[in-house]
């Protein structure tokens, strides 16, 4: 049995891509997208017609509506291939505006519903800022399920659990990147691999907290740099993996053992944690890595959203 099939015994495998033509070969349950992945996809010749068709069909509409229609078009194509859910991201430029995030999310869901898709097959991706988490709380209360992304800290995860969001995406690779850069020449790759990887440790701590305290929010590890990080999180509720790493897993027959387990998490001695807004902001501020990576991630997604807008305006 290859590693991909072995992993699927313990974990729901999700494909992290906008390149939906790659999906079928890996048979993922769900798929995730973001502005950067959509931007990358529409610059490929095989996907350029989707952008052109969207601009032509909805000519004269506001650019933000055209953007939403394009990402929903990609989402619909993905949902025609996979059996589960697709995650579609709200414009990252709204990351600090609760009301605007809610409004944009509702429009995205309405666009999916207009295509005949059930609301339960869509997760709205929102950056895990305080404002984003509060938007997710409101959306969940309205029956719209959310995926809180750009999650780098335990405090973000705790606040998401308190808000009863459907799913969180704690990032592994970007945490690894930060610590590796900080260590510089002193970084020991072998010593910091697997269970010692700081990104892996972050997800494990969040998973154990959720399962120990019976928090229903799903944990989907994201942002991987190598298959070792993925295998070290076998048993996590879900893992979203780029096609390149899915291919590496499919090509390897190395063993995959379950690492994360809800029963084991319940036996870990843990103290309950809760955050109000002030406590959340202070905890996030105290975590230099999470503060820097959250800000960097929002800037990057916002920049790619702006580039996508430029491509759409040029195609008009």
Curated annotation (Swiss-Prot):
One of its GO terms (molecular function) is transaldolase activity. It catalyses: D-sedoheptulose 7-phosphate + D-glyceraldehyde 3-phosphate = D-erythrose 4-phosphate + beta-D-fructose 6-phosphate. GO terms for biological process: carbohydrate metabolic process; pentose-phosphate shunt. Its EC number is 2.2.1.2. Keywords: Cytoplasm, Pentose shunt, Schiff base, Transferase. It is found in: Cytoplasm. Pathway: Carbohydrate degradation; pentose phosphate pathway; D-glyceraldehyde 3-phosphate and beta-D-fructose 6-phosphate from D-ribose 5-phosphate and D-xylulose 5-phosphate (non-oxidative stage): step 2/3. It is an enzyme of class 2 (transferase). One of its GO terms (cellular component) is cytoplasm. SUPFAM superfamilies: Aldolase. PROSITE patterns: TRANSALDOLASE_1, TRANSALDOLASE_2. The active site is at residue 125. PANTHER family: TRANSALDOLASE. Transaldolase is important for the balance of metabolites in the pentose-phosphate pathway. Belongs to the transaldolase family. Type 1 subfamily. Homodimer. This is Transaldolase. It comes from Acidovorax sp. (strain JS42).
């Amino acid at each position: 049995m290859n590693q991909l099939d072995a992993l699927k015994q313990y974990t729901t495998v999700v494909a992290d891509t906008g390149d939906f033509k790659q999906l079928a070969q890996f048979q993922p349950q769900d798929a995730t997208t973001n502005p950067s992945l959509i931007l990358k996809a529409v610059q490929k010749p095989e996907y350029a017609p989707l952008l052109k068709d969207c601009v032509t069909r909805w000519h004269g509409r506001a650019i933000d509506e055209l953007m939403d229609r394009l990402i929903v078009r990609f989402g619909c194509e993905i949902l025609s291939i996979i059996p589960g859910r697709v995650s579609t991201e709200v414009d990252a430029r709204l990351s600090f505006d609760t009301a605007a995030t809610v409004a944009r999310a509702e429009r995205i869901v309405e666009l999916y519903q207009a295509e005949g898709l059930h609301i339960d097959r869509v997760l709205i991706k929102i950056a895990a800022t305080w404002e984003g988490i509060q938007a997710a709380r409101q959306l969940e209360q309205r029956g719209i399920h959310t995926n809180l992304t750009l999650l780098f800290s335990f405090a973000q995860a705790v606040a998401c659990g308190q808000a009863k969001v459907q799913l969180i995406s704690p990032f592994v690779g970007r945490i690894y990147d930060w610590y590796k850069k900080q260590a510089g020449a002193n970084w020991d790759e072998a010593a910091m691999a697997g269970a010692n990887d700081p990104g892996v440790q972050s997800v494990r701590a969040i998973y154990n907290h959720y399962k120990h305290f019976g928090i229903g929010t799903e944990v989907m590890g994201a942002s991987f740099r190598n298959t070792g990080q993925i295998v070290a999180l076998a048993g996590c509720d879900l893992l979203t993996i780029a096609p390149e790493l899915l291919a590496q897993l499919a090509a390897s027959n190395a063993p995959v053992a379950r690492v994360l387990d809800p029963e084991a998490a319940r036996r870990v001695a843990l103290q309950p944690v809760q955050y109000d807004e002030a406590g959340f902001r202070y905890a996030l501020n105290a975590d230099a890595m999470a503060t820097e990576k959250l800000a960097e991630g929002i800037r990057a997604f916002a920049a790619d959203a702006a580039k996508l807008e430029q491509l759409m305006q040029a195609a008009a």
